[in-house]
Amino acid sequence: PLKNVTVDVYDRMLVYPGGIPFGVKLHTQGVLVVGIAPGDSQSPAYNAGIRVKDIITAISGKPVNSIEDVTRIVESSGGKPLDFTVTRGDSEYIFKVTPGWDKNENKYKAGIWIRDSTAGIGTITYIVPETLQFGGLGHGICDVDTGDLMPLLTGSVSDVTISGITRGRIGLPGELKGYFGAEKIGSLVANTHVGVYGVLKSMPQNIISEPIPIALRHEVREGDAVLYTTVDGNTVGQYSVKISNINRNDGDTKSFIVTITDPRLLELTGGIVQGMSGSPIIQDGKLIGAVTHVMINDPTKGYGIFIETMLANCP
């Protein structure tokens, strides 16, 4: 019975398709270890057992969420051991780190490189009319060095104006270039492996469609569809694409293949480029999903995610 309930909810659901670029600033919960100081012997944290990809959540019982938090505690330690609370996968560990004296900089250090935030551009997939909740990107925001999903503490959403394009070539994905608007237009509430989710303060002016139904995965078919995306300023364009290789059992970010067939888009971008992730795909008047990845060896092709998967993971 549970399955039917889910289907009924989605059957009646109407959403605005997006295609609108947005800027994300994400601050992590805890700080992410992205590197070890050169020469492992000089890294007290490494010697204590801390590794790249670990997330440091507290030091000697004090929560840490920024590089400044960690630096302040380590530098004022006087070289006494500190208890680093670390999340690794699903487990939590405590490592006793004794900061070392750096004679070049005259201060105590733990010997690790850490990161506490990131920023980037993506595309909004859908907006729920009643609540202004949105989903976008169709994949998670991951750390550039470790490839791991970044744990979200807080995040803000800005509008973005697309100011240029680096065209995609075989072996070298292109990208949309843009600048963030001064105003925050919303906030992020979740960063998941199938997309980012948040709430907007108001309905964007550049929506180009009334709310439309969503397609369940069994309704998605091979053949023609339309991609909504923004490649110039903040005007959403509609471009023809083809859907193929549908894997209905896939609950992840590569559920079908999207091929760009529109000569205008191919001319402008060479195909799918970074920044387009989350661009909604409409087929038979329904929102079927979003573009998630470009194929490195053929930028005219990429992968898509079912809208059903994105909605199922919405917090």
Model-based region annotation:
Residues 2-10, 71-111:
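PDZ-domain C-terminal substructure recognizer with occasional recognition of PDZ-binding tails
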Residues 3, 20-22, 27-32, 52, ...:
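Envelope-exposed proteins and targeting segments
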Residues 100-270, 274, 284, 292, ...:
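Serine endopeptidase catalytic core focused on the charge-relay Asp
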